[in-house]
From Swiss-Prot:
Compositionally biased residues, Basic and acidic residues: 395-407
One Gene Ontology cellular component: host cell nucleus
Gene (UniProt): TRM1
Database matches in InterPro entries: UL28/UL56
Binding site for ATP: 619-626
Gene Ontology MF terms in the entry: ATP binding; zinc ion binding
First-listed, main subcellular location of the protein, grouped into a coarse class: host cell
Function: Component of the molecular motor that translocates viral genomic DNA in empty capsid during DNA packaging. Forms a tripartite terminase complex together with TRM2 and TRM3 in the host cytoplasm. Once the complex reaches the host nucleus, it interacts with the capsid portal vertex. This portal forms a ring in which genomic DNA is translocated into the capsid. TRM1 carries an endonuclease activity that plays an important role for the cleavage of concatemeric viral DNA into unit length genomes.
Keywords, comma-separated and alphabetical: ATP-binding, Host nucleus, Late protein, Metal-binding, Nucleotide-binding, Viral genome packaging, Viral release from host cell, Zinc, Zinc-finger
Name of the protein described by the UniProt record: Tripartite terminase subunit 1
GO BP field: viral DNA genome packaging
Quaternary assembly: Associates with TRM2 and TRM3 to form the tripartite terminase complex. Interacts with portal protein.
Zinc finger annotations (C3H1-type) as residue ranges: 173-201
Amino acid sequence: MSGLLAAAYSQVYALAVELSVCTRLDPRSLDVAAVVRNAGLLAELEAILLPRLRRQNDRACSALSLELVHLLENSREASAALLAPGRKGTRVPPLRTPSVAYSVEFYGGHKVDVSLCLINDIEILMKRINSVFYCMSHTMGLESLERALDLLGRFRGVSPIPDPRLYITSVPCWRCVGELMVLPNHGNPSTAEGTHVSCNHLAVPVNPEPVSGLFENEVRQAGLGHLLEAEEKARPGGPEEGAVPGPGRPEAEGATRALDTYNVFSTVPPEVAELSELLYWNSGGHAIGATGQGEGGGHSRLSALFARERRLALVRGACEEALAGARLTHLFDAVAPGATERLFCGGVYSSSGDAVEALKADCAAAFTAHPQYRAILQKRNELYTRLNRAMQRLGRGEEEASRESPEVPRPAGAREPGPSGALSDALKRKEQYLRQVATEGLAKLQSCLAQQSETLTETLCLRVWGDVVYWELARMRNHFLYRRAFVSGPWEDRRAGEGAAFENSKYIKTHLFTQTLSSEHLHALTHSLYTFITGPLAEESGLFPPPSNVALARCCDAAGTLPHQKAFLTSLIWPGIEPSDWIETSFNSFYSVPGGSLASSQQILCRALREAVLTVSLYNKTWGRSLILRRADAVSPGQALPPDGLYLTYDSDRPLILLYKGRGWVFKDLYALLYLHLQMRDDSA
């Protein structure tokens, strides 16, 4: 079934992408018959699939099914907008973004006002509800999630690219927190390090692909290559963009003059052979020609990129005249970005990555335009170095051949006497100093360019919708849906609290007050308690699932839990804890919350969960039973027969359900339930 759902999703997703492009094109360029045909097929698919998807999502949902519902609804609206009778010309998308504000209700009558304006707001709401899920009934949870899901559907639209105004990459999501927890935090919460993290999960960056040349290929495939040739002929000539400089003209000419005395009858020394080979292999270089100009021939890469955009726009107009008989006005023609804006949004024939690379090249060219830096760069060129060494060896060989008597060598480090020696030494020191300054400057330049280009690329790169928000919504919805399905089962109601139930509860409490828990088991019981207050988002299956305390810490860090609240959770169980510390003397009031703040309600309910964990463990030890405490959301709605045990439903009205051999009983008092379990003969729960 999941394969069929994925197949339907892929087809609807492809249609949504095409619709998002069509909304930005000139209506005259659209094939109305094809749009009508696709709209009819979409209506057919929606009539068959959408009602079933909604029924399925009311029982158990997935990120794929939730997004598919949104794509079906939004594609229907986009198709209707394309076929609107009064649609003329291109329409600029509205700048207004949807938002919603409502109150989230918790136990004790406490309400929290939330305002959702961004995709991050929805994701943050999921993390916060995940940390206090046990403070809400399934009705409260589903109502709060439904409003957020509706807003996410309006955010989703039909475009695979989310509106950049709807998300912030500097806010870590649930998966970012999980990645940060792998790194050492030196005792600090993961959210403290999250301020320096760029989230790539809400909006996933797309790997940059070459854009240059795609339009030209499409034109040639349409049989209009002559238009490109006409544009190339009209383009003014100039040096090739991005040419890398080699050794300068003086070095090349000097090497050529040094080789003029050799011919096929000459004896060729090794130095001459190496010099000739170097000139041969560099004969195709750009810098040994007649230009002698710097990198890029003195032209700006960014200006060349923008000029190419203008030239290809003219070619596109000529293609439209040849194919459609008239020039069309699309959205990117009606609202053309300026030079500065194009740095952020890219162009039709180039991406923002191309603009970043061109800007990086221009910055480097501007820095190296200084004559001193150019000289240093030239001397660092490998070909220049080898050429100079070969010429020096050749010069030394000629001098040794013509020298009659060797000169008396001077000691190392000695300089020629007189003003000329001092001046030569000063010039060498100056050259060495400038070389060192240039080397350090180039190193800093490369580091700065790499860092800034990485930041720009990460900020301006194309991003598509991620699945993390839909995944979180599906997890949280399934939690509350499973709870609703479980408490709605055909269980016998024992919440009345008649006189016999009070005596039964008193009997169990009296016996448990005289017992103690083994100190060796307290550590395991602490982790067991953590599993009952850990949110549904942390329920990850795999070969190496995280420990319960790590999963709980991730929930707290993601939700922004305060340190003193974390300390309260870790202090629920301590060494030497006695039954009188956790057993409540009241009757038939388990998981009841009086009015108060959310923080006080959270503490009361955590103590109630602690009471259930420790009491069941002490009960099994005292009477030799094997009652297992379970979570109600662990039972899927389609599961035929849940395993026996005591289920915590997190529902204030029906908090405890005992299952035994296919039968179930609903209790409001924990100890009356244990008394019923004690009466059962064959204990397999």
